[in-house]
Amino acid sequence: MAAEGSKPVRIGLLGRGTVGAAFAGLLAERADAVEAATGRRPEITGALTRSEGDFEAILAGSDLVVELMGGTEPAREHVLAALRAGKPVVTANKQLLAQHGDELFAVAREAGVQLRFEAAVAAVIPIVRTIQESFGVTEIAKVFGIVNGTTNFILSEMAATGAGYDQVLARAQELGYAEADPSDDVNGADAAAKMAILARLAFHTPVTLSEVAYEGIEAIQPDDLAYAKELGLSLKLLGVAERRDGGVSVRVFPCFLYPGHPLAPIEGAFNAVMVEAPAISEVTMSGPGAGGL
């Protein structure tokens, strides 16, 4: 029950796919803890899917909106409407932010409401808050890491078992680490969108997905992993954002890492992000990076 005299926080949920359903389950499971911490109990008062639900009714009956639809439309339209209606929005939609971040953040500022997006980058790793708060006045030179758990799982399994790409991808799908259509994960687009967001945060400059050079892991063969193993190297799909030649360079590419590199031991469906800043050297954070949440 909500604390006496308090009202529940009414949440309008946009999207009930893998992530949306996992969020709803986790919220129900931890409702008591949220209430104890905030004094208000979270309550999903309406949910919208691509085929069911009334967006206007959900918006009117909510205090905040959680967008987990994926894709750019109709997610963009709904998020803009929520912000203009004065409703704070939480989103995990990295494609939406990478392609339309300028517009969304501008509308949020004009409306005086928050647009939060921690879950859009590197899953459970609190890298967004770390960059915004811990590095608030510290100049960052470089942000790089493993930001896609699906591809890291595939490369790790190929290296450990000698199995081919298609076989390991099927295994990742069985385990829930890869979508039925894994294209954005394996071709590097998902990681590219996340790196565009991190670059914007780290360097305080707009970076769109079209400005990120990226390639994925579809062409990686078992022989590539065997060769790396012989040399004591690890093969990872890395995202890199750094200051270069007076501007910002952002790219995603498969890369061999030497033994002892902080990212070399990151295996399976895990993410890890490193931040380099002259004033503090470097910080590394890691955590689970694929699946429902």
Please state what every model-predicted region is.
Residues 2, 260-293:
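ATP-dependent carboxylate/acyl-activation modules
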Residues 2-87:
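N-terminal glycine-/serine-/threonine-rich beta1-alpha1-beta2 phosphate-ribose binding loop
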Residues 64-67, 90-92, 115-119, 142-145, ...:
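General beta-strand structural signal in soluble alpha/beta enzymes
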Residues 70-72, 95, 120, 148, ...:
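Short glycine-rich anion-binding loops that position phosphate/pyrophosphate groups of nucleotides
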Residues 109-112, 116-185, 189-190, 197:
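Rossmann-like NAD(P)H-binding beta-loop-alpha module
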Residues 167-265, 270-272:
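Substrate-binding/catalytic subdomain of NAD(P)-dependent oxidoreductase enzymes
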